[in-house]
């Protein structure tokens, strides 16, 4: 039997721009596509 916790769209192509990203509980959805801007790097240790 399959694991019911895994969503069926886990195996869908996840390239930036192929799927609409909605802001939800998962912060990763917000961090993926920022419409052409550079990735925001947050340094946690050292400098």
From Swiss-Prot:
Q: Name one GO cellular component term.
A: endospore-forming forespore
Provide ranges: composition bias, Polar residues. 29-47
Q: List, in alphabetical order, the GO biological process terms annotated in this UniProt record.
A: asexual sporulation; sporulation resulting in formation of a cellular spore
UniProt keywords (A-Z) are: Sporulation
Induction record: Expressed only in the forespore compartment of sporulating cells.
Cellular compartment(s): Spore core
What Pfam families does its record include?
A: SspN
Cysteine pairings via disulfide bonds: none
Region described as Disordered: spans on this chain: 1-47
State the family named in the UniProt similarity comment for this chain.
Belongs to the SspN family.
Q: What is this protein called?
A: Small, acid-soluble spore protein N
């Amino acid at each position: 039997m399959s694991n019911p916790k895994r969503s069926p769209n886990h195996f869908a192509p996840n390239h930036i721009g192929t799927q609409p990203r909605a802001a939800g509980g998962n912060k990763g959805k917000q961090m993926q596509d920022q419409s052409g801007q550079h990735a925001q790097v947050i340094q946690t240790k050292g400098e």
